[in-house]
Amino acid sequence: MAKQTLGSLLSSGFDLAGKRVLVRADFNVPLDAQGNITDDTRIRAALPTVQALTQAGAKVILTSHLGRPVKKDKETGAVKVAREGNSLAPVATRLSQLLGQPVAFAPDCIGPEAEAVVNRLENGQVALLENVRFYPEEEDNDPEFARKLASLADLFVNDAFGSAHRAHASTAGVTAYLQPAVAGYLVERELQFLSGAIEDPRRPLAAIIGGSKVSTKIGVIERLLEKVDKLLLGGGMIFTFYQAQGIQTGKSLVETDKLDLARSLMEKAKERGVELLLPVDVVVADRFDKDAQAQTVSIHAIPEDWMGLDIGPESVKAFQSALQGCQTVVWNGPMGVFEFDRFALGTEAIARTLADLTQAGATTIIGGGDSVAAVEKVGLADKMTHISTGGGASLELLEGKVLPGIAALTEA
């Protein structure tokens, strides 16, 4: 299901000069209490697409969401929109600094105010529309709202991978009115790595899956068992697998309704000849707290009133040994409670191992979410082959799901 991309459009000689191009970006950035952007990674990620369009002489109209401004009253169904703290105005300022050119900010995303800003654009200039989620119709994928948004432009570029798993007006709905609808450079790169790594990898292929709950990773584990040579599990989910084998887990997090599932996943790994590795030792704590008492124990010796919060040093060694020689490694989810420094050692060790593998020529893909934060925390983000910008979108793509924002694009 190959899709048209901005790269293929430009290389085919398509003339973008003077064309109004609606670009759906993901500018859902964190802001502090004063409205300052605390992390501009997502803005920087959109730069290659924006710069390619300005250089081609297009009139660039950027759109995005920020936060969750729409609040629905459960009792009455009444809708309130919280504009305070959710405006994209700070993004326009930062984008202008990064691009080295003015970015016109429209105080609305549809209607006369948006039209006035777009109409003033010259070739190679950039405008940013206000938060599309100020309209509840955005998340409802309302056709009339999508039509109004689309009426501002001549063609559509989706570069918001982080929102590609949502069928919203600005990610999917506008494609009914704007053709061609193509993938931007960021989306193209995400698809290339996250789909390519699973469908056509250099082998051996290993996946490392962490995180606190099996329930959130069922789909991805099931699919990976059909594709990988090795599967390494860490994070809070491991205790459900231990209890499924009759191992006592103390007060560790266990999803008792997923014990049968854990057994069936272990069985499936065996049937498929996948090497499934679980930690052999864990760092346990007497309570869930950064200052808790901690000790490292074998998985067969977890004290009754203690809880596991990280993988232990022997597990790190076993994981490092299993990863040696792997040509492709996909990682999603931390090995422990990495927000607490003393329970972050397992996650940090795996991050360093992947950085070394990258240096040795392996393809390493950090599949979104908390594992990205963990890699950034140890300053190794630039040492990986690819860091995904998606959370839920990365996970759904790894699960093999069709993402609505991608499905809606023009076929190649």
Swiss-Prot record:
Ligand binding (ATP): K217, G308, E339, G368, G369, D370, S371
Subcellular location: Cytoplasm
Positions bound to substrate: D26, F27, N28, R42, H65, L66, G67, R68, R133, R166
ATP-binding recorded as keyword: yes
Pathway: Carbohydrate degradation; glycolysis; pyruvate from D-glyceraldehyde 3-phosphate: step 2/5
CDD domains to which the protein is assigned, alphabetical: Phosphoglycerate_kinase (cd00318)
GO annotation terms (biological process): gluconeogenesis; glycolytic process
Keywords carried by this UniProt record: ATP-binding, Cytoplasm, Glycolysis, Kinase, Nucleotide-binding, Transferase
Gene3D superfamilies: Phosphoglycerate kinase, N-terminal domain
Enzyme's top EC category: transferase
A GO term for molecular function: phosphoglycerate kinase activity
Subunit and interaction comment: Monomer.
Family: Belongs to the phosphoglycerate kinase family.
Protein name: Phosphoglycerate kinase
Organism of this sequence: Synechococcus sp. (strain JA-2-3B'a(2-13)) (Cyanobacteria bacterium Yellowstone B-Prime)
Gene (UniProt): pgk
